[in-house]
């Protein structure tokens, strides 16, 4: 039996890394919002407050999901919400994340160039996940913490768990190979509609991908996107898109 006294000489912080994806046919991105307990609480409370402000209007409810693509494009549950209101929601959400104490890690890959260069390329999600986890591991190490990874549900999640286990035993592929010593357990998958933290990761990753792959033709739209992203820029711990 392990006693409390036996644990006290080895204190360790724990952070959570919430991961989501965004992609086009040519580029694939993953983003992680890395939080301690206090930052997680600030994001949950902040995003809940934003949605509550709009509950009862435009068909929205207190449980409406903050999902990057529908919110940005005015689709699905955001179909009846005016553009100005959607911009307000997105910017307020990014302000909450930026002020929470969270750190953001962003990785991507040029999928078109990968297909052109390799005869039998690895799935983009697997490649970028390895790159992202390396940087989340670095982020946790600098914080003097271990990290638990939580990702949005995907149909290939069992394969990602297997890859994660292989990374931790044999090392990640590539020149920065590491066994991810700061990451613990497995990758945990959860439905984003029940997690404001996963929604935060989705909002961040979608807008990062949008800005990287789709320059706005309208100067006003570009200015709005820049203003929204300005809340995230100061808390980006790492950002890179691999060009094979």
Where do the PLM segments sit?
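Phosphate-ester processing/binding pockets and catalytic centers
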Residues: 1-244
């Amino acid at each position: 039996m392990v006693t409390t006294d036996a644990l006290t000489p080895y204190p360790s912080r724990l952070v959570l890394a919430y991961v989501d994806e965004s992609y086009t046919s040519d580029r694939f991105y993953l983003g992680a919002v890395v939080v301690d307990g206090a930052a997680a609480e600030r994001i949950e409370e902040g995003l809940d407050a934003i949605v509550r402000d709009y509950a009862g209007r435009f068909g929205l409810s207190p449980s409406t999901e903050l999902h990057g693509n529908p919110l940005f494009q005015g689709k699905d549950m955001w179909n009846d919400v005016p553009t100005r209101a959607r911009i307000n929601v997105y910017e307020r959400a990014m302000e909450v994340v930026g002020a929470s104490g969270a750190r953001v890690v962003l990785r991507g890959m040029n999928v078109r160039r990968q297909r052109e260069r390799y005869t039998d390329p690895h799935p983009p999600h697997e490649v970028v996940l390895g790159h992202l986890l390396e940087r989340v591991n670095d982020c946790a190490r600098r914080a003097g913490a271990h990290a638990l990874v939580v990702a949005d549900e995907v149909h290939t999640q069992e394969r990602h768990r297997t890859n994660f286990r292989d990374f931790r035993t044999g090392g990640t592929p590539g020149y920065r190979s590491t066994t991810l010593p700061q990451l613990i357990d497995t990758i945990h998958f959860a439905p984003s509609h029940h997690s404001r933290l996963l929604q935060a990761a989705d909002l961040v990753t979608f807008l990062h991908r949008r800005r990287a792959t789709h320059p706005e033709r309208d100067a006003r739209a570009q200015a709005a996107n820049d203003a929204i992203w300005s809340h995230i820029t100061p808390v980006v711990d790492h950002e890179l898109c691999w060009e094979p």
